[in-house]
Amino acid sequence: GWFADYLVNKELVEIYQGKAHIYRDSIMLTTSPGIDHDIVEAEKLMVEGEVEQALEMLNRLSENNPDLRQQAFINYTLAEAYKLKGEIDKQIYRLALTAIADLKFGTREYASLQKLAYLLYDKGDVDRAYKYLTCSMDDAVACNARLRFSEVTEFFPIVDKAYKLKEEKGRTIRYGLLFFASF
């Protein structure tokens, strides 16, 4: 699953996706029925193309007042399901809920806030994307999460440049208004 996302070689991608499938099945066989089991089952359904069924299961789980850690996993998995359906606004909403839970839980090695930043940047919200990526980068450094730091630093220069251009444009407009106001 997740490791395969970082591979280029198609054969290796298939090998690691196969291993993820085996591990997912093993988890389902060894965990007791409950929320954690159902989250893994929903992930399996998504991989098998049964996104609607996964959404129904995850939304039902979300309504049962799970603890904060479980709620974070449910919302993150819901965000992934909405991504598969192309429902970006719902994906953003669920990533925001996940990021809030991560922050409340004290998690510093997370993916939700940076994924949220990418989506907000794509929607033109450069300010929030910049703030969220900066926070993600600071947390990745603080907890020595090399992979998360690497992920953030791949995209940060793009957002940083857009943010600085926006700030410069704002300064230019303010100076122009001050100049014309002085006459």
Residue spans of the language-model regions?
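A "functional boundary" signal
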Residues: G1-T172
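Selective detector of the "anchor" transmembrane alpha-helix that sits immediately C-terminal
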Residues: G176-F183
